[in-house]
UniProtKB/Swiss-Prot annotation:
SUPFAM superfamilies: Class II aaRS and biotin synthetases, GAD domain-like, Nucleic acid-binding proteins. This is Aspartate--tRNA(Asp/Asn) ligase. One of its GO terms (cellular component) is cytoplasm. The gene is aspS. Homodimer. It comes from Mycobacterium bovis (strain ATCC BAA-935 / AF2122/97). GO terms for molecular function: aspartate-tRNA ligase activity; aspartate-tRNA(Asn) ligase activity; ATP binding; nucleic acid binding. Belongs to the class-II aminoacyl-tRNA synthetase family. Type 1 subfamily. Transmembrane segments: none annotated. Its EC number is 6.1.1.23. Residues 197-200 are annotated as: Aspartate. GO terms for biological process: aspartyl-tRNA aminoacylation. Aspartyl-tRNA synthetase with relaxed tRNA specificity since it is able to aspartylate not only its cognate tRNA(Asp) but also tRNA(Asn). Reaction proceeds in two steps: L-aspartate is first activated by ATP to form Asp-AMP and then transferred to the acceptor end of tRNA(Asp/Asn). It is found in: Cytoplasm.
Amino acid sequence: MLRSHAAGLLREGDAGQQVTLAGWVARRRDHGGVIFIDLRDASGIAQVVFRDPQDTEVLAQAHRLRAEFCVSVAGVVEIRPEGNANPEIATGEIEVNATSLTVLGECAPLPFQLDEPAGEELRLKYRYLDLRRDDPAAAIRLRSRVNAAARAVLARHDFVEIETPTITRSTPEGARDFLVPARLHPGSFYALPQSPQLFKQLLMVAGMERYYQIARCYRDEDFRADRQPEFTQLDMEMSFVDAEDIIAISEEVLTELWALIGYRIPTPIPRIGYAEAMRRFGTDKPDLRFGLELVECTDFFSDTTFRVFQAPYVGAVVMPGGASQPRRTLDGWQDWAKQRGHRGLAYVLVAEDGTLGGPVAKNLTEAERTGLADHVGAKPGDCIFFSAGPVKSSRALLGAARVEIANRLGLIDPDAWAFVWVVDPPLFEPADEATAAGEVAVGSGAWTAVHHAFTAPKPEWEDRIESDTGSVLADAYDIVCNGHEIGGGSVRIHRRDIQERVFAVMGLDKAEVEEKFGFLLEAFMFGAPPHGGIAFGWDRTTALLAGMDSIREVIAFPKTGGGVDPLTDAPAPITAQQRKESGIDAQPKRVQRHDQIFAVTTSHPSVNK
C-alpha cells in the first residue's frame, strides 16, 4: 500500500505514530517559511505541516505544491499547538509533521476552483474534478449505501438478484427505443431495454418466484430538464402475491433506505385513490407536506352567464394573502400559465371587507359573488385562482398552481417527508391525451395503457375491458414522496386471453402482437403463475435521500438535460467505415420460413449466393 492510514480518520489517540498518507492538496498555505497543506482523501482532510528548516529538499518540494497535486506524505502525528485546533473538521486536534514528500501526479491549471461555485456544463465536462468536492462525492457514496441497504432487505426475503439482457428486440413499451445495429445481421437492430419488464415476467414463469435487479434502463425521450436517457431502477417481481404483499415489501425497503439518513417512515404508508388524488390535488403525484387543496366549482357555476366558466370543469385553488399581490405579479401568473400551454389563470381577489375584485368578479352574478368565498374557503385578503376547460388539463394547471403558491409563500418544510401510495388508477387512457402529454401511445387504437400493456385490471373489471374501457381500474400502485413518484408497480397479466384482449383494445393487430410479443404469450401457455412487482426510480430516490434537487447530482457521469455528455462529447457522428460495417443502411426484406419471421437483406453477399 502507498499509505498506512486514511487522512480523515486520524485522531488525538494517533499522536506519536509514524504515518504515510496519500491524497490531494486541497489547500496550501505558506506562513513565514512554514508550509501547511490540507491533504484530502476519500475519508476526509488532515493538516500536514512542513516546518523542518534542516530538510531543505522537502521544503523546496512543498513550495512547488499547488492545489490538486496528488501526493504521498510521510510524517509523525502530533497534537496541534494550543489555540490552533480546528473544530470544523474531524481531524482538527492533530496535524502531521512531514518528514518526506512524493509528488505522485502534478495538476494542470484548474478549469474551476473546487471550493467555489461552477456552472453545470463546466462541472460535467470535468466531472472527475467535480467529484473531488465534498457534496458530489458524498452523494455518489450515499448511492452505494442505498444499493447495499436495498440488497440486504431483499436478501432477507429470499429474493434472487438476476441480470436480464441489455440488448434485446424492440418492443413498444411507452417510449422510443435506443436502437443498436446488429453487424452480423445487416438491416436488423437490437434495442436497449426501456425496462426489464418482459424478462422479469418470464423469470416468474421460469419459477424464480422472487427476483430483483438494480437495472440500467434506456428511453429515447424528448429533452426534459431532469430526465436522463439512461437511468437506473430497483426492479422487483414476485410470484403468488397480490398488491398487498408487494406494497409490504416495498415499505420495508423504503424504511431501510430512509433510516440511512436518520428518518423513520411511519408505516403503514397512507393510501389515496387515483381519482381522489386528481380531484383534490390535480395530480397523481401529490405533495402532502402542505394543504391548499383544489375546490370543485363546476356545480357552483352550473348556471353561470360567464362564458369562460361554461366548461366541463371549473376548479379553484386559494392563495392565502394573495389579494395583496401587485398587478404586475398577477400578470406574471398569466405568463406562468401560458408557459404551461394554457390561455391564462383567472383570479378573484377577496378584499379585507369581503368584497370581490379583479377582472373575473365583474362577470359574476350577485349570487355567485355572495357565495364564492364560502364555497372555496377563501378569507379576506386571499386570492382565488381558477381554471376552466377539460377536466384533466384544468386540474393539472391548478395542481401546478398549488405547488407554485406553496413555494412562493414558503409553506413547504424542506425537512419534512410525506409519503403516500396512489392506488387504483385507470387501466387505459385516451391515446390522444397520452400523445398530447408527450408520451408515446402504444398501438393504433383510441385507447392506450396508462402504465404499460402488461398491467392487470382489477379482477372485478376483467369482464368490462371492451365494453367500459375508460372506467376499468388497474391493479396498480405508485409510491409518491414529497410530490415525486419514486416507484410504481402492478399485478401483471398472466393469462394469454386477457393479455390479447388488452392488446386488442390498444389497437395492436394479431400479426404485430405475434411478431413483437409472441414469446411472452407463448410462455403464458406453460403454467404462468400469478405475479406482480414494482420498480423504484433509483436516481430520484437517491437524490431525495441526498437532499439534491437534480438526479444528475447522484449519477457519476450524467448527461445534460439535452442528452449530451460534455465529458466525452457524446453523442457523436460515426465514421463512414463504422456505418458500412454496422449494416445500418441495409434494406431488410421480410420472408416467412418455418413458421417464423426472419429479417434478411438482399445487400448481404450470403443472401445473393
